[in-house]
């Protein structure tokens, strides 16, 4: 068992360098740290991810992320995968991969109606659910740009939240202790529509108390970012997928902005 309060006991070997639960935490950690989602287990899940350990107590903690879990379950079922925290499923939701293409449109549509029919007006419910046949996928970008954004008018505060909440990508320029200087394309409002501007310099956090998930990032590397936090170093395949699914869901959101 992992002593999530501090030191660790003997740790079981993992079947892969980055287990699905560990990757999930890399992305969920900062919004949870900011009290936007999940339970009150921030330091515990952080320690679990640092140790790369998966145990039943951790899974119970992660299931408190009620915004993400239905998408993970949907992706897993659509691909015949039993474990919603399978590494491929987790990557599909946060970054994007081919698993998203195997989820049936009707399943996403039905899931959205089941989840949000009591929270949204009939007009907004149909607007959101109709994005499934319009090409939306069960990706975090869709959740941010279309499900979360149920406002009639975008302003600066909402735009900043969308930009922080989406998973973005940046290229490392320099390293400064627990921070990185990166070049990142920001989300902007242009002509009343969402768009991505050319990359701009930005400072992001990669460590808390000297610990993080991208300790070996080097200048030139691509990293993923969530609420100003460096989630992990990306391969070129992952970066390309993240950009592809981000641009897809920006375009789909713009259909009703």
Where are these regions (language model features)?
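Short, basic/aromatic beta-hairpin or loop at an interaction surface
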Residues: 187-207
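Structural detector for short beta-strands of small beta-barrel domains
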Residues: 160-183
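Short, Lys/Arg- and Gly-enriched loop/turn segments at beta-strand edges
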Residues: 228-241
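Short peripheral tails and domain-boundary helices/loops at the edges of structured domains
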Residues: 238-257
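N-terminal intrinsically disordered, low-complexity, charge/repeat-rich segments that act as generic
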Residues: 2-157
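Short, well-ordered loop/turn sites that connect or cap secondary structure elements
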Residues: 216-217
């Amino acid at each position: 068992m992992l002593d999530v309060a501090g030191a660790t006991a003997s740790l079981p070997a993992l079947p892969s360098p980055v287990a699905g639960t560990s990757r999930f935490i890399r992305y969920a950690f900062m919004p949870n740290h900011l009290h936007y989602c999940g339970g009150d287990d921030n330091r515990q899940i952080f320690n679990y991810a640092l140790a790369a350990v998966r145990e039943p107590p951790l899974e119970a903690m992660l299931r408190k992320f009620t915004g993400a879990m239905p998408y993970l379950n949907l992706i897993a079922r659509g691909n015949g995968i039993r474990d919603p925290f399978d590494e491929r499923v987790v990557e599909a939701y946060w970054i994007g991969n081919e698993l998203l293409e195997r989820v049936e449109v009707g399943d996403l549509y039905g899931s959205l109606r089941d989840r949000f029919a009591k929270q949204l007006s009939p007009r907004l419910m149909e607007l959101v659910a109709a994005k499934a046949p319009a090409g939306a996928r069960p990706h975090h970008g869709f959740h941010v740009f279309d499900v979360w954004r149920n406002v009639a008018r975008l302003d600066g505060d909402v735009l900043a939240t969308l930009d922080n909440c989406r998973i973005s990508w940046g290229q490392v320029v320099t390293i400064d202790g627990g921070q990185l200087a990166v070049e990142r394309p920001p989300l902007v409002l242009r002509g009343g529509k969402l768009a991505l501007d050319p990359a701009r310099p930005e400072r992001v956090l990669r460590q808390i108390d000297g610990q993080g998930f991208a300790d070996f990032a080097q200048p030139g590397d691509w990293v993923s970012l969530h609420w100003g936090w460096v989630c992990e170093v990306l391969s070129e395949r992952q970066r390309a997928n993240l950009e592809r699914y981000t641009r897809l869901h920006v375009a789909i959101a713009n259909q009703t902005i």
